[in-house]
Amino acid sequence: MTDRILIARIGAPHGVKGEVRLFAFGEDPLALKRYPLTDESGARRFKVQSLRAAKDHFVARLEGIADRNAAEALTNTDLFVPRDALPAAEDEDTFYHADLMGLRVEDQSGALLGTVLAMHDFGAGDVLEYTPEGGGRTLLLPFTKAAVPVVDVPGGRIVVVPDTNPDETPPEDADQA
């Protein structure tokens, strides 16, 4: 497991006074003001002075960023927080996305299907993206108990049920072409 968790990404500048768009990945975006944030290398530290909600993101003022040029230089900077600064998982079905990256993806018989590449939230719930073992296009699955019944972070694997979307099954009387 990684020592630091990706918690937000800095977007484009907002205005001319150094504010930035901020895309938060945690359940409590306002908690960003309490966390010690760093860039990916850990060398640069950030402190959120103010944070307010906007349409599909937040607008933040970061300590030491006073103008648009300084804000622009931070565009697409990922912000990390030390794992020990975050609350512990509330239950056994709660995971940090960072802990799922790189896990083996297996079917219910234990056959290797691929490797977890990413987790996405497109607004209707988390979606798991994995790279198939034999190569090819990545595959997406809803990150639900039905589609992903087993998450074994210490064991380095997840178990998936690939065909869990009944809407993709054609009706029995569908024409065969």
Swiss-Prot record:
Q: Where in the cell is it found?
A: Cytoplasm
UniProt record similarity statement: Belongs to the RimM family.
Q: Which Pfam families match?
A: PRC_RimM (PF24986), RimM (PF01782)
Organism lineage reads as: Bacteria, Pseudomonadati, Pseudomonadota, Alphaproteobacteria, Hyphomicrobiales
Q: What is its main location?
A: cytoplasm
UniProt GO molecular function = ribosome binding
**Subunit structure of this chain's protein:** Binds ribosomal protein uS19.
Q: What is the protein name stated in its UniProt record?
A: Ribosome maturation factor RimM
Q: What does this protein do?
A: An accessory protein needed during the final step in the assembly of 30S ribosomal subunit, possibly for assembly of the head region. Essential for efficient processing of 16S rRNA. May be needed both before and after RbfA during the maturation of 16S rRNA. It has affinity for free ribosomal 30S subunits but not for 70S ribosomes.
What processes does the entry annotate via GO biological process terms?
Answer: ribosomal small subunit biogenesis; rRNA processing
Give the GO cellular component terms, alphabetically.
cytoplasm; ribosome
Source domain of life: Bacteria
What InterPro entries does the record point to? PRC_barrel-like_sf, PRC_RimM, RimM, RimM_N, RimM_N_sf, Transl_B-barrel_sf
What domain comment accompanies this record?
A: The PRC barrel domain binds ribosomal protein uS19.
